[in-house]
């Protein structure tokens, strides 16, 4: 009796097989492969992600238990835990990274006109942040973190129109967040929202010269002088001040010689005054505050996706770790 197509089989129909096979050929992923091809590896890891398996061993046991229907799921054959682990270690993770970027390139235009709450401008909006995943430095020596601990960082540039990652960069835990700005090609007229950890005036000035806009918060040790005041704001909205400032220390004003805008906002929920800095002098002060508030959308994204490496005890190489992270 035909009961229809399994949901998992319907999901994997969206994988562009032609493009995937091109990437496998490019990176020689199926070199000497017999039963566990790159495509079969991809399906098994996706199966584990969708079904909430906690480790590679769980994936293999679950697939073995459903051996009779694997063909209908689109999976050729289940493999042992050791075979799947070796495939993750040895097959170039760039295969799955470039597949992900290809799919993102298809999906992002579909949401390019999505409205963002309380935002009136039509510019491209990005939120930049990272999430840190703890691991054992003994079992994953490649994942160096602070204080002799193991950690991996996933730096994500999130397109706020649709909450779709525009770029993902995986590093060890010692990679400072501000270094990530050097990995990004600024998009003219786009807004980049980031917290104060990303305040690197040399990198931010590069964004400014590329006609891209950034919004962040000042560090506690930032020294500046006020050179202009603006009064075109409604205090009832929470805006307390709108200034144009200039950096005063020798190093900072050399790195960023142009004026910067500073907006002060009173948060009625916490009772605190919050300061924002930006290179955009045109939008309203309230728009600046609302844009930065949407930086929290990326925190929600990390929480919703539950970015954890459940099977990190298996990840004894960076290639293994990157492969599993990219497929989660």
Q: Regions from the language model: what does each represent?
A:
Residues 143-145:
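Extracellular beta-strand-rich solenoid/capping regions of secreted or surface-exposed proteins
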Residues 55, 73-76:
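Short, surface-exposed helix-loop/turn micro-motifs enriched in polar/charged residues
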């Amino acid at each position: 009796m035909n009961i229809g197509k399994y949901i998992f089989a319907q999901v994997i129909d969206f994988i562009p097989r032609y493009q995937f096979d091109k990437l496998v050929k490019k990176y020689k992923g199926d070199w000497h492969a017999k039963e566990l091809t790159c495509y079969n590896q991809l399906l098994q890891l996706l199966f584990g992600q969708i079904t909430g398996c906690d480790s590679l061993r769980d994936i293999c046991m679950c697939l073995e238990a459903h051996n009779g229907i694997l063909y209908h799921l689109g999976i050729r054959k289940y493999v042992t835990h050791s075979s799947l682990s070796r495939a993750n270690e040895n097959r170039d993770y760039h295969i799955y990274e470039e597949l992900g970027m290809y799919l993102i390139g298809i999906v992002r235009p579909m949401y390019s006109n999505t409205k963002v709450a309380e935002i009136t401008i039509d510019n491209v909006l990005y939120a930049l942040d990272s999430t840190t995943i703890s691991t054992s430095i003994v079992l994953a020596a490649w994942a160096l973190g602070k204080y002799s601990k193991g950690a991996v960082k996933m730096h994500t540039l999130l397109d706020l129109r649709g909450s779709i990652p525009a770029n993902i960069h995986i590093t060890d835990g010692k990679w400072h967040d501000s270094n990530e700005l050097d990995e990004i090609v600024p998009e003219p007229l786009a807004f980049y929202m980031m917290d104060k950890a990303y305040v690197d005036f040399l990198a931010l000035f590069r964004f400014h010269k590329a006609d891209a806009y950034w919004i962040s918060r000042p560090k506690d040790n930032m020294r500046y002088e006020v050179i202009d005041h603006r009064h075109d704001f409604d205090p009832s909205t929470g805006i307390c001040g709108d200034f144009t400032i200039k950096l005063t220390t020798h190093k900072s004003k050399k790195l960023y010689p142009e004026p910067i805008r500073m907006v002060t906002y009173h948060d009625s929920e916490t009772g605190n005054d919050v300061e924002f800095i930006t290179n955009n002098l045109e939008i309203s002060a309230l728009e600046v505050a609302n844009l930065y508030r949407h930086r929290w959308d990326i925190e929600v994204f990390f929480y919703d996706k539950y970015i954890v490496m459940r099977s990190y005890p298996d990840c004894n190489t960076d290639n293994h770790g990157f492969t599993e992270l990219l497929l989660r």
